[in-house]
């Protein structure tokens, strides 16, 4: 169903891959992009469970907006193994204004399609989503 505000639909594969990440843990991350011509959000890249946070960060384009989901594993101060699912809205300052507007207006609706997001992060440059930021937001 298209979003009235931005006219964006969400491809079924987006939800399916997210469920695989959440329930089966078969992916470390998923990068989503908006296909403007088809007016829908689609899966652009899927990260294997063995890939690192650096691999994930490197998969985001330098000058284009993206949505991403990252399954972050960490150990608490009490030495407990935990996991948090992050939703990251990547919107670099160097992206086209039109692209930033489309991603901003579609974000909330898209995020609602992904049931199980635990932490949301908005990032305009790599320092705003560095591993230190992820670690502090996970706790």
Swiss-Prot record:
InterPro entries: ADF-H (IPR002108), ADF-H/Gelsolin-like_dom_sf (IPR029006), ADF/Cofilin (IPR017904). Residues 5-139 form the ADF-H domain. GO terms for cellular component: actin cytoskeleton. The keyword Transcription does not apply. Gene3D superfamilies: Severin. Keywords: Actin-binding. SMART domains: ADF. It comes from the Eukaryota. One of its GO terms (biological process) is actin filament depolymerization. Pfam families: Cofilin_ADF. PROSITE patterns: ADF_H. One of its GO terms (molecular function) is actin binding. CDD domains: ADF_cofilin_like. The keyword Zinc-finger does not apply. Actin-depolymerizing protein. Severs actin filaments (F-actin) and binds to actin monomers. Belongs to the actin-binding proteins ADF family. This is Actin-depolymerizing factor 1. It comes from Petunia hybrida (Petunia).
